């Protein structure tokens, strides 16, 4: 996820920072708890090697496609493998590890504004795990004030950078875009969530899912956002997530050939 300093975020609120402010990637589940093993199995780790550490997160949205963000495709580490259905940061203890055969960014991605910060990975073979549901195109699955859940393997401590070995989750409240726009230069391809000090995403979670839970199990979970950018980890500002509903046409053009 990309980071704007707390000072810069305050300046944005005062109109002192332009909409072209640079963003810095984030990757952490701060203030969360371990997700029970065997749940949220659509959550995907992106790795350079079959048993290496996940450096980004993603979501299995079809048997052969993982949804993530563009930073995960252009970093130092190559997105060569995904871990699906695993509870752990690395290794081959559980779940499955599948080779990535293609990776592409949204055709409308804007690296300056961060708009359409969405990417897709195509897998060498189908996953046996059930994909997460995609949101409705009319944005009805994401409403200001609702609670959502961020899931990932990012740092659990900041600035000491304590790594999460097990999958973590934290509940975050969704903001109205107009309200969030007083802090950040956001547009309708983004959604803000969080804002409680000590509960946030940061280093390690980039690309991972922001989920709308619709029941006690995972069957009806919907991926409404993807970890994209924000202020320094856990300082009390919301994180900014890619709004998945705005990318559905592009996603379907690849996963369904439409």
Curated annotation (Swiss-Prot):
PROSITE patterns: TRYPSIN_DOM. Induction: Expressed during infection and the expression levels increase with disease progression. Keywords: Disulfide bond, Glycoprotein, Secreted, Signal, Virulence. Glycans are attached at residues 90, 105, 110. InterPro entries: Peptidase_S1 (IPR050430), Peptidase_S1_PA (IPR009003), Peptidase_S1_PA_chymotrypsin (IPR043504), Peptidase_S1A (IPR001314), Trypsin_dom (IPR001254). Secreted effector that suppresses host plant glucan elicitor-mediated defense responses. Targets host endoglucanases and inhibits the endoglucanase-mediated release of elicitor-active glucan oligosaccharides from P.infestans cell walls. This is Glucanase inhibitor protein 3. The lineage of its organism: Eukaryota, Sar, Stramenopiles, Oomycota, Peronosporales.
């Amino acid at each position: 996820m990309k980071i704007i300093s707390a000072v810069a975020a305050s300046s944005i609120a005062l109109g002192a920072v332009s909409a072209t402010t640079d963003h810095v990637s984030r990757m952490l589940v701060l203030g969360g708890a371990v997700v029970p093993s065997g749940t949220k199995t659509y959550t995907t780790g992106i790795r350079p090697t079959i048993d290496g550490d996940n450096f980004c997160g993603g979501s299995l949205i079809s048997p052969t496609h993982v949804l993530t963000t563009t930073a995960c495709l252009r970093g130092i580490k190559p997105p060569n493998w995904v871990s699906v259905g695993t509870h752990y940061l690395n290794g081959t203890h559980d779940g499955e590890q599948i080779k990535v055969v293609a990776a592409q960014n949204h055709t409308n991605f804007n690296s300056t504004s961060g708009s359409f910060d969405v990417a897709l990975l195509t897998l060498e073979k189908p996953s046996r795990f059930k994909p997460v549901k995609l949101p409705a195109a009319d944005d009805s699955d994401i409403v200001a004030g609702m609670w959502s859940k961020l899931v990932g393997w990012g740092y659990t401590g900041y600035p000491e950078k304590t790594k999460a070995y097990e999958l973590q989750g934290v509940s975050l409240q969704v903001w109205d875009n107009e309200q969030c726009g007083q802090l950040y230069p956001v547009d309708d391809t983004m959604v803000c969530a969080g804002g409680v000090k000590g509960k946030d995403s940061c280093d390690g979670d980039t690309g991972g899912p922001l989920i709308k839970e619709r029941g006690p199990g995972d069957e009806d979970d919907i991926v409404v956002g993807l970890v994209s950018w924000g202020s320094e980890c856990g300082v009390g500002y919301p994180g900014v997530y890619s709004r998945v509903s705005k990318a559905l046409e592009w996603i379907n053009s690849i996963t369904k050939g439409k």
